Amino acid sequence: MKEDHFPVTHTDAEWRKILTPEQYDIMRAHGTERPGSCALLYEKRPGTFVCAGCGQHLFESKTKFESGTGWPSFDTPVEGGVETSIDRSMGMTRTEVHCARCGSHLGHVFPDGPPPTGLRYCINGVATNFTPAAAN
């Protein structure tokens, strides 16, 4: 993944100021949070999950489902919200999911999700913030 093609860019020092140490480890150093460790795993209100680094809309809560993995899981991203690349780390080939606006690592996508897409976007909760839908 070429870091300089994203609309939002920062130096490493700037990212370290913007993000918490845990967010930096996951979003910029491609780490993974412990399963079940993020409160957003249990978020059920209507709203939008956005990138913690730049505010890009990533997933709508209506696409979130309980996968039993310990990470927030979604079957469909917001159009244009995420991009993917091949991740060959850890001795396996996976599809990495990153923010389309700032390139931050979000998680991975797997072909074992529910209909209609059959996809499971397995996302590190700490890489997102939740914005509740406006009350009508």
Feature annotation, model-predicted:
Residues M1-H5:
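Accessory (non-J-domain) regions of J-domain/Hsp40 co-chaperones
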Residues F6-N136:
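A short Gly-Trp-Pro
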